[in-house]
Regions:
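Metal-ion/cofactor- or nucleotide/acyl-coenzyme-handling active-site neighborhoods
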Residues: 1-257
């Protein structure tokens, strides 16, 4: 499979390559189709999952279990534009709560927060390792990376500079749905930290009457996980930036400043 990668970059085979590799290794293409069509898995994730199946291994990597100190408050940073638009207020809120860890669901806006001194946890699912390498340099990386429980269906990818500071969750205990999503990992991190107050920013939701398939999947995924988390956990999810998710408790971050 490694030999395919330079050819993929040259010829841009897109989603055809996973099918080609699956066929060459007698792996059911129906399963590959479900990865390509039904979920927003990255190309690299799909190829890695196929390679793991070819090699008959559960996963291509394993890391130590997360051992975390408790934290009463946790801030989860999503990928929505509100986490950028209201950054000055968010930064002020963070600095006023120095013991509050920051959990990044995605590294999309991680560079904005690089100078914030609070403990940082980066969720690595799907294409997030690649995004993290693009948006955060080794010099600006301070914190830990967090993976879903072993084994991971789509395999494991971690930036080389984070190899020694990467951990995996023992379990996703609050839901049986979407256990391989970044939101599930972030919410489980809050449980592991024994948080009683969970704040989120950047979970804007998707506007418009007609959503793309990816937007519909992600919107429903987040909605279900928020509901499951609040049903099974005492912590309330407070969104400090505007959000279309009705099951979040919407508050203005400016009231905390």
């Amino acid at each position: 499979i490694t030999a395919f990668m330079p050819l993929y970059e040259e010829h841009k085979w897109g989603t055809n390559l996973p099918y080609m590799i699956a066929g060459a290794n007698s792996i059911p293409q129906k399963e590959v189709m479900s990865w390509v069509v039904n979920r927003a898995y990255s190309f690299n994730s799909i190829v890695r999952a196929v390679e793991n199946k070819k090699n008959k291994v559960k996963d291509n990597a394993r890391y130590p279990m997360l051992k975390s100190n408790t934290a009463a408050k946790v801030l989860i940073v999503g990928g929505g534009n509100s986490s950028v638009e209201h950054f000055d207020a968010i930064e002020e809120f963070i600095l006023a709560n120095p013991d509050m860890p920051i959990v990044f669901v995605t590294a999309r806006h991680a560079s904005l927060y690089k100078s914030v001194p609070n403990r940082k946890i980066y969720c690595l699912i799907g294409n997030e390792a690649k995004r993290m390498k693009k948006n955060l340099s080794e010099e600006d990386y301070h914190g830990i990376c967090l993976l879903s429980p072993y084994p991971r269906v789509m395999g494991t990818e971690v930036p080389s500079f984070a190899e020694d500071t990467t951990f995996e969750l023992p379990a996703i205990s609050f839901t049986s749905y979407y256990k391989d999503s970044c939101t599930a990992v972030a919410l489980q991190a809050c449980i592991e930290l024994s948080a009683t107050e969970v704040f989120v920013v950047g979970y804007d939701g998707y506007k418009g009457e007609i959503l793309s398939e990816k937007e519909m999947v992600l919107s429903n995924e987040n909605k279900v996980l928020f509901e499951e988390f609040m049903k099974s956990n005492k912590a309330i999810l407070n969104s400090l930036t505007p959000s279309l998710y009705k099951n979040l408790n919407i508050k203005s971050i400016y009231q905390f400043l």
